Amino acid sequence: MLKYILSLCLFFNTLILANDFEDFEQEYQKKEVKDSFYAYNKAMSKFNYDLYTYFLRPVALSYKSITPSFIRTGVKNAFDTTRSSFRFINHLLSLEFRKAGEEFGRFCVNVIFGFGLLDSASKTPLKSYEADFGTTLGKWGVGSGPHLVLPLLGPYNVRDALALPVNWFMVPEGYIENFWVGAGVNAALKLNELSFEYEKIDDIYQNSVDYYTFIRDAYEQRRQELIK
């Protein structure tokens, strides 16, 4: 049962980390998306919607109600600090040395002046740029392939789905010997982040004429922007 619950908590990973839907709505341009698995994707999207609505969202709201804001903010900043090395490595693999340098600089500032718990780097000109092994493959010319909705994890495409195992071993919890302990740590961090982001996700589900199509197009457009 514990393993099942921990797995469920991973679902909204992509909704939070792989998309900035508010920015997307401002710059969105309609683009045809290859959706070879449409029927499956549509059904899995409905499954993930129900999972979010009836399990993840209530858990996140309960967590928010009992956890002081400064603790949640500290955990969120610590989570982002642990991801600096992840982004740094992918920038190097993509030969984007300026972005890698900025990411390294942000990490140093946050660790030295914020003890990893404060986003001290936000007060500097240093920027953080989203990157993962899927975007690295894209920058080296690997095509995205058809859109693919994964159970629990949400929207992906074939390239990004194949990059998931590499992504896992680029983050600290991927090196915890017991996989389910590592997954539990990851799930707890993502649950904390959902406590900040649930209103954006609610807006997508409630105000989109067809949330599956919107999320699919938003995901693919965002990923394309990241590899330019």
Which positions does each model-derived feature cover?
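Sec-dependent N-terminal signal peptides
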Residues: 4-13
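A structured, mid-to-C-terminal "fold-capping" secondary-structure block
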Residues: 20-32, 135-228
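Boundary at the C-terminal end of the N-terminal hydrophobic targeting segment
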Residues: 16-18
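Short, membrane-interfacial amphipathic segments enriched in basic
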Residues: 29-40, 49, 68
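A small/polar active-site loop signature that marks catalytic segments
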Residues: 73
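Membrane interface segments of multi-pass transport proteins and intramembrane proteases
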Residues: 54-70
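Mid-length scaffold segments of soluble, non-membrane domains
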Residues: 78-155
